Amino acid sequence: PQGRYLYRARTSMNSALNGSKSHREWYIDCLKNYIFWALDEAKSRFGAIPDYVQYNVMYDLQGRFKVDEIPETVLTPHEKTIFLKMLFDAVFQIDDHIILEQKNLSMELKDYIMSIKKAPDSGTLQFDDKSEDAWFQYPDLSTGHASSYQLRLTSMELMKHDILLEGAAKIYLRFPYPANLFLRITTGHTTHMVKCCFREDPEHVFRFNGQKLAVFLKFTAVIPYEMFSGITHIEFCWDCDGHTICYHSLHRMSEFPLAYGQQKLLLN
Protein backbone atom coordinates (compact mmCIF):
# COMPACT_ATOMS: atom_id res chain seq x y z
CA PRO A 1 0.00 0.00 0.00
CA GLN A 2 1.07 3.54 -0.70
CA GLY A 3 0.11 6.79 0.95
CA ARG A 4 0.75 10.46 0.50
CA TYR A 5 0.41 13.51 2.70
CA LEU A 6 -1.43 16.64 1.61
CA TYR A 7 -0.61 19.74 3.65
CA ARG A 8 -2.36 23.06 3.04
CA ALA A 9 0.15 25.81 3.78
CA ARG A 10 -1.24 29.12 4.96
CA THR A 11 -0.13 32.22 3.11
CA SER A 12 -0.18 34.02 6.46
CA MET A 13 2.63 31.67 7.62
CA ASN A 14 0.92 31.15 11.00
CA SER A 15 0.14 27.44 10.70
CA ALA A 16 0.98 24.93 13.41
CA LEU A 17 4.01 23.81 11.40
CA ASN A 18 5.34 27.35 11.03
CA GLY A 19 4.78 28.01 14.71
CA SER A 20 6.57 24.82 15.72
CA LYS A 21 9.86 26.11 14.34
CA SER A 22 10.11 28.60 17.18
CA HIS A 23 9.82 25.94 19.91
CA ARG A 24 12.64 23.82 21.31
CA GLU A 25 10.39 20.76 21.58
CA TRP A 26 9.98 20.54 17.81
CA TYR A 27 13.72 20.12 17.35
CA ILE A 28 14.77 17.77 20.14
CA ASP A 29 11.81 16.33 22.03
CA CYS A 30 9.90 15.36 18.88
CA LEU A 31 12.92 13.52 17.49
CA LYS A 32 13.56 11.78 20.78
CA ASN A 33 9.98 10.84 21.64
CA TYR A 34 8.50 10.22 18.20
CA ILE A 35 11.06 9.80 15.40
CA PHE A 36 13.45 7.47 17.22
CA TRP A 37 10.56 5.69 18.91
CA ALA A 38 9.02 4.95 15.48
CA LEU A 39 12.33 3.74 14.04
CA ASP A 40 13.17 1.58 17.07
CA GLU A 41 9.63 0.17 17.28
CA ALA A 42 9.72 -0.82 13.60
CA LYS A 43 13.08 -2.56 13.99
CA SER A 44 11.83 -4.34 17.10
CA ARG A 45 8.63 -5.58 15.43
CA PHE A 46 9.82 -6.32 11.91
CA GLY A 47 13.59 -6.67 12.16
CA ALA A 48 13.95 -3.81 9.66
CA ILE A 49 12.27 -0.49 9.01
CA PRO A 50 9.49 -0.86 6.39
CA ASP A 51 9.33 1.70 3.59
CA TYR A 52 6.05 3.18 4.80
CA VAL A 53 7.58 3.90 8.23
CA GLN A 54 10.66 5.41 6.60
CA TYR A 55 8.51 7.59 4.35
CA ASN A 56 6.39 8.79 7.26
CA VAL A 57 9.51 9.62 9.30
CA MET A 58 11.28 11.33 6.40
CA TYR A 59 8.20 13.38 5.61
CA ASP A 60 8.30 14.69 9.17
CA LEU A 61 12.06 15.25 9.14
CA GLN A 62 12.16 17.27 5.93
CA GLY A 63 10.68 20.30 7.68
CA ARG A 64 13.78 20.46 9.90
CA PHE A 65 15.97 20.81 6.82
CA LYS A 66 13.97 23.84 5.68
CA VAL A 67 15.00 25.95 8.67
CA ASP A 68 17.57 28.46 7.39
CA GLU A 69 19.12 28.99 10.80
CA ILE A 70 18.01 28.09 14.31
CA PRO A 71 17.91 31.17 16.57
CA GLU A 72 19.88 30.93 19.82
CA THR A 73 16.69 31.98 21.58
CA VAL A 74 15.27 28.58 20.60
CA LEU A 75 18.32 26.31 20.97
CA THR A 76 21.62 27.00 22.68
CA PRO A 77 24.77 26.18 20.66
CA HIS A 78 25.12 22.94 22.66
CA GLU A 79 21.49 21.99 22.04
CA LYS A 80 21.88 22.75 18.33
CA THR A 81 24.84 20.35 18.17
CA ILE A 82 22.71 17.66 19.83
CA PHE A 83 19.82 18.34 17.45
CA LEU A 84 21.96 18.13 14.31
CA LYS A 85 23.51 14.85 15.47
CA MET A 86 20.05 13.42 16.20
CA LEU A 87 18.74 14.66 12.85
CA PHE A 88 21.44 12.94 10.83
CA ASP A 89 21.38 9.83 13.03
CA ALA A 90 17.73 9.52 11.99
CA VAL A 91 18.41 10.27 8.31
CA PHE A 92 21.14 7.62 8.22
CA GLN A 93 18.42 5.05 8.94
CA ILE A 94 16.37 6.14 5.91
CA ASP A 95 17.01 4.46 2.55
CA ASP A 96 18.35 6.71 -0.20
CA HIS A 97 15.36 6.26 -2.50
CA ILE A 98 12.97 7.39 0.26
CA ILE A 99 14.93 10.62 0.69
CA LEU A 100 15.12 11.27 -3.05
CA GLU A 101 11.37 10.64 -3.48
CA GLN A 102 10.39 13.51 -1.16
CA LYS A 103 8.41 16.00 -3.25
CA ASN A 104 8.86 18.96 -0.90
CA LEU A 105 12.62 18.61 -0.44
CA SER A 106 14.67 20.76 -2.81
CA MET A 107 17.30 19.31 -5.12
CA GLU A 108 20.11 21.04 -3.27
CA LEU A 109 18.92 19.68 0.09
CA LYS A 110 18.69 16.15 -1.31
CA ASP A 111 22.28 16.34 -2.53
CA TYR A 112 23.43 18.00 0.70
CA ILE A 113 21.90 15.15 2.72
CA MET A 114 23.44 12.52 0.45
CA SER A 115 26.87 14.17 0.60
CA ILE A 116 26.83 13.77 4.40
CA LYS A 117 25.03 10.43 4.52
CA LYS A 118 27.54 8.77 2.20
CA ALA A 119 30.59 10.46 3.75
CA PRO A 120 31.31 14.06 4.74
CA ASP A 121 31.48 16.23 1.59
CA SER A 122 31.39 13.16 -0.64
CA GLY A 123 30.18 12.93 -4.22
CA THR A 124 32.31 13.51 -7.31
CA LEU A 125 31.44 16.34 -9.69
CA GLN A 126 30.81 14.94 -13.17
CA PHE A 127 30.37 16.79 -16.47
CA ASP A 128 28.70 15.58 -19.66
CA ASP A 129 29.57 18.03 -22.41
CA LYS A 130 27.36 16.23 -24.94
CA SER A 131 24.18 16.74 -22.91
CA GLU A 132 25.54 19.97 -21.39
CA ASP A 133 24.91 18.89 -17.84
CA ALA A 134 26.69 18.29 -14.53
CA TRP A 135 25.87 16.34 -11.38
CA PHE A 136 27.35 14.72 -8.29
CA GLN A 137 28.10 11.04 -8.59
CA TYR A 138 28.07 8.65 -5.63
CA PRO A 139 28.94 4.93 -5.75
CA ASP A 140 25.30 3.89 -6.21
CA LEU A 141 23.41 7.02 -7.34
CA SER A 142 23.67 10.50 -8.80
CA THR A 143 21.99 13.71 -7.65
CA GLY A 144 21.59 17.38 -8.37
CA HIS A 145 21.67 17.60 -12.17
CA ALA A 146 22.53 21.24 -12.84
CA SER A 147 20.31 21.42 -15.95
CA SER A 148 17.22 20.62 -13.85
CA TYR A 149 17.43 23.62 -11.54
CA GLN A 150 14.70 26.16 -12.08
CA LEU A 151 14.88 28.96 -14.61
CA ARG A 152 12.26 31.70 -14.25
CA LEU A 153 11.23 34.20 -16.90
CA THR A 154 9.64 37.28 -15.38
CA SER A 155 9.30 39.86 -18.15
CA MET A 156 9.88 40.61 -21.81
CA GLU A 157 9.81 44.17 -23.12
CA LEU A 158 9.75 45.23 -26.76
CA MET A 159 12.06 48.19 -27.29
CA LYS A 160 12.89 50.14 -30.44
CA HIS A 161 15.73 47.93 -31.65
CA ASP A 162 15.88 45.12 -29.08
CA ILE A 163 13.99 42.80 -26.78
CA LEU A 164 14.73 43.13 -23.07
CA LEU A 165 14.36 39.78 -21.30
CA GLU A 166 14.46 39.41 -17.51
CA GLY A 167 14.41 36.39 -15.26
CA ALA A 168 16.21 34.42 -12.57
CA ALA A 169 18.23 31.20 -12.61
CA LYS A 170 18.70 28.95 -9.59
CA ILE A 171 22.28 27.84 -8.91
CA TYR A 172 23.40 25.15 -6.45
CA LEU A 173 26.51 26.59 -4.83
CA ARG A 174 28.25 23.24 -4.59
CA PHE A 175 28.86 23.64 -8.33
CA PRO A 176 31.60 26.06 -9.40
CA TYR A 177 30.16 29.58 -9.43
CA PRO A 178 29.05 30.70 -12.92
CA ALA A 179 31.69 32.55 -14.91
CA ASN A 180 28.85 33.93 -17.01
CA LEU A 181 25.19 33.39 -17.87
CA PHE A 182 24.25 33.61 -21.53
CA LEU A 183 21.57 32.99 -24.16
CA ARG A 184 22.30 30.78 -27.15
CA ILE A 185 20.10 31.98 -30.00
CA THR A 186 19.83 29.78 -33.09
CA THR A 187 18.07 30.69 -36.34
CA GLY A 188 18.56 28.16 -39.12
CA HIS A 189 22.29 27.43 -39.24
CA THR A 190 23.29 30.65 -37.47
CA THR A 191 23.96 30.78 -33.72
CA HIS A 192 24.52 33.90 -31.61
CA MET A 193 25.63 34.18 -27.99
CA VAL A 194 24.18 36.97 -25.86
CA LYS A 195 25.74 37.51 -22.44
CA CYS A 196 23.46 38.33 -19.53
CA CYS A 197 24.03 40.78 -16.72
CA PHE A 198 23.35 38.95 -13.46
CA ARG A 199 23.49 39.34 -9.70
CA GLU A 200 22.39 37.33 -6.68
CA ASP A 201 18.86 37.93 -5.46
CA PRO A 202 19.14 38.51 -1.68
CA GLU A 203 15.46 37.64 -1.24
CA HIS A 204 15.93 34.15 -2.68
CA VAL A 205 18.83 32.57 -0.81
CA PHE A 206 18.44 28.98 0.38
CA ARG A 207 20.25 27.94 3.56
CA PHE A 208 20.44 25.12 6.06
CA ASN A 209 21.94 25.67 9.51
CA GLY A 210 23.31 29.01 8.36
CA GLN A 211 25.11 27.50 5.35
CA LYS A 212 24.18 29.00 1.99
CA LEU A 213 23.28 26.15 -0.37
CA ALA A 214 21.66 27.80 -3.38
CA VAL A 215 20.70 31.19 -4.79
CA PHE A 216 18.68 32.69 -7.59
CA LEU A 217 20.69 34.84 -9.98
CA LYS A 218 18.56 37.65 -11.41
CA PHE A 219 19.52 38.31 -15.01
CA THR A 220 18.76 40.69 -17.87
CA ALA A 221 19.55 40.17 -21.54
CA VAL A 222 19.21 42.53 -24.50
CA ILE A 223 18.52 40.73 -27.78
CA PRO A 224 18.68 42.70 -31.07
CA TYR A 225 15.75 42.10 -33.40
CA GLU A 226 18.19 41.30 -36.19
CA MET A 227 18.92 37.97 -34.49
CA PHE A 228 15.34 36.87 -35.21
CA SER A 229 14.60 35.73 -38.76
CA GLY A 230 12.23 32.82 -39.16
CA ILE A 231 11.95 30.20 -36.44
CA THR A 232 14.36 31.07 -33.62
CA HIS A 233 15.39 28.79 -30.77
CA ILE A 234 16.64 30.33 -27.51
CA GLU A 235 18.55 28.31 -24.91
CA PHE A 236 19.56 29.53 -21.45
CA CYS A 237 23.06 28.45 -20.45
CA TRP A 238 25.82 29.13 -17.94
CA ASP A 239 29.55 28.55 -17.82
CA CYS A 240 30.48 26.05 -15.09
CA ASP A 241 34.26 25.82 -14.80
CA GLY A 242 34.65 25.94 -18.58
CA HIS A 243 31.73 23.57 -19.26
CA THR A 244 28.40 24.72 -20.70
CA ILE A 245 25.28 23.88 -18.68
CA CYS A 246 21.95 24.25 -20.51
CA TYR A 247 18.77 24.69 -18.45
CA HIS A 248 15.91 22.27 -19.10
CA SER A 249 13.46 23.41 -16.42
CA LEU A 250 11.68 26.59 -17.53
CA HIS A 251 9.01 28.31 -15.45
CA ARG A 252 7.03 31.32 -16.60
CA MET A 253 6.14 33.63 -13.74
CA SER A 254 2.68 35.20 -13.55
CA GLU A 255 4.12 38.48 -14.85
CA PHE A 256 5.20 36.84 -18.11
CA PRO A 257 4.27 37.48 -20.89
CA LEU A 258 3.64 41.20 -20.63
CA ALA A 259 1.52 43.22 -23.02
CA TYR A 260 3.42 45.79 -25.05
CA GLY A 261 1.11 48.23 -26.80
CA GLN A 262 -1.35 46.14 -28.81
CA GLN A 263 0.96 43.11 -28.88
CA LYS A 264 1.55 40.24 -26.51
CA LEU A 265 4.59 37.98 -26.65
CA LEU A 266 4.17 34.32 -25.82
CA LEU A 267 6.96 31.89 -25.07
CA ASN A 268 6.45 28.56 -26.83
Please identify what each model-predicted range represents.
Residues 2-34, 48, 67-80:
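Nucleotide-sugar-dependent glycosyltransferase catalytic core
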Residues 50-63, 107-108:
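Amphipathic alpha-helical protein-interaction segments enriched in hydrophobic
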Residues 22-25, 48, 52-55, 150-157:
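Short, solvent-exposed segments of well-ordered alpha helices
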Residues 5, 36, 58-59, 85:
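Active-site-proximal helix/loop capping residues that flank conserved catalytic or ligand/cofactor
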Residues 57, 68-75, 83-268:
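Basic, ligand-binding patches in group-transfer machinery
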Residues 33-55, 67-73, 175-177:
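Conserved, well-structured beta-alpha core segment at the onset of a catalytic domain
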Residues 30-44, 80-93:
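Amphipathic alpha-helices of TPR/Sel1-like and other helical repeat/solenoid scaffolds
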